[in-house]
């Protein structure tokens, strides 16, 4: 073990146990760590060189384990696992937290006008569609027409629900402030979650129709599976809903408690920075937790796949009982 009680780097094993939720949570805390956004081209190049030298047996893994883990963290948060190319900085998962703090603050603005509501829903879905596209499974190829259709659908759903539900809550004219506030809090959550799920289903729908690459434990790709594609898309859609739940519902509740304090009443200008801090704190925990619900490299039983994958043998002549696929983010 290293000085930080991490396993000695071996280039194969994970820093944390990806078989457990907590292990995956710790792993995605690394991947979503905004500090990796400050990694320079030089840092990226040095990280690649260090790991390449390790593979060649030129680096002592015991002596340089911490440096190797740091290099892997930089690459994992920057490089797409399928293409091996850097993901455009704003659309890396590590950028999701700082960017969405601002977006969430806009989505839950109290007494927002219809124009403001539409604007923030549009901004949110525009960012989500770009994030989905940048982090999709590499075997997912979409035409510009399909991307535009997905984008228009997601924006249309989110804006329609946000405006329609907001109008509906106002028309109900509920006198009980607690119930009225609760319903108002549900409006952005329902709109964002519904559109987010639709966004994933539309953007990655061809993965369910055409399938995604599946491989064995040795990394050998054995073809495309529609069942694996469905599994990947459903898992990501569920994770997106899980991300929205705490990020959009908890901040108004927490801020409601702060609003009652004498400090906030005395200094009302602290409300916005305090609101942003609350959203950031919640996102910092909820984002990696939601992504960690399912492993990035998920496994699926051969029996759950199409018939042609049920009697395939690996390089040692053994029938493959379990395949691996990249579920994407």
Swiss-Prot record:
Its main location: mitochondrion. The keyword Disulfide bond does not apply. One of its GO terms (cellular component) is mitochondrial inner membrane. GO terms for molecular function: monoatomic ion transmembrane transporter activity; transmembrane transporter activity. InterPro entries: Mtc (IPR004686). It comes from Dictyostelium discoideum. This is Sideroflexin. Mitochondrial amino-acid transporter that mediates transport of serine into mitochondria. Belongs to the sideroflexin family. It is found in: Mitochondrion membrane. Keywords: Amino-acid transport, Membrane, Mitochondrion, Transmembrane, Transmembrane helix, Transport. The chain crosses the membrane at residues 95-115, 147-167, 183-203, 238-258, 274-294. GO terms for biological process: amino acid transport; mitochondrial transmembrane transport. It is a multi-pass membrane protein. It holds the Pfam family SFXNs.
């Amino acid at each position: 073990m290293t000085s930080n009680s991490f396993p000695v780097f071996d280039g194969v094993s994970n820093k944390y146990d990806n078989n457990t939720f907590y292990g995956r949570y710790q792993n995605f805390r690394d991947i979503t760590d905004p500090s990796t956004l400050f990694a320079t081209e030089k840092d990226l190049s040095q990280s690649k060189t260090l790991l390449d030298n390790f593979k060649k047996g030129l680096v002592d893994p015991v002596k340089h384990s911490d440096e190797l883990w740091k290099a892997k963290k930089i690459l994992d948060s920057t490089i797409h696992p399928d293409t091996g190319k850097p993901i455009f900085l704003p659309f890396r998962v590590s950028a999701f937290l700082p960017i969405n703090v601002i977006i969430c603050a806009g989505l839950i603005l109290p007494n927002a006008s219809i124009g403001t509501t539409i604007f923030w829903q549009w901004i949110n879905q525009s960012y989500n569609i770009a994030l989905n596209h940048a982090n999709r499974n590499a075997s997912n190829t979409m035409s510009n027409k399909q991307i535009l259709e997905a984008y228009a659908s997601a924006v249309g759903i989110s804006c329609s629900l946000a405006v329609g539900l907001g109008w509906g809550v106002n028309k109900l004219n509920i006198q009980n402030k607690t119930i009225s506030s609760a319903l108002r809090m549900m409006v952005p959550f329902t709109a964002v979650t519904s559109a987010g799920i639709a966004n994933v289903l539309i953007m990655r729908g061809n993965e369910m129709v055409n399938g995604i690459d599946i491989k064995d434990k040795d990394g050998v790709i054995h073809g495309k599976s529609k069942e694996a594609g469905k599994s990947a898309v459903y898992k990501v859609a569920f994770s997106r809903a899980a991300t929205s739940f705490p990020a959009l519902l908890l901040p108004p509740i927490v801020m409601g408690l702060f609003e009652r304090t004498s400090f906030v009443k005395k200094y009302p200008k602290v409300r916005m920075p305090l609101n942003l801090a609350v959203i950031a704190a919640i996102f910092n925990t909820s984002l990696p937790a939601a992504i960690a619900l399912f492993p990035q490299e998920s496994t699926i039983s051969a029996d759950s796949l199409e018939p042609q994958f049920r009697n395939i043998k690996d390089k040692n002549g053994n029938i493959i009982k379990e395949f691996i696929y990249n579920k994407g983010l």
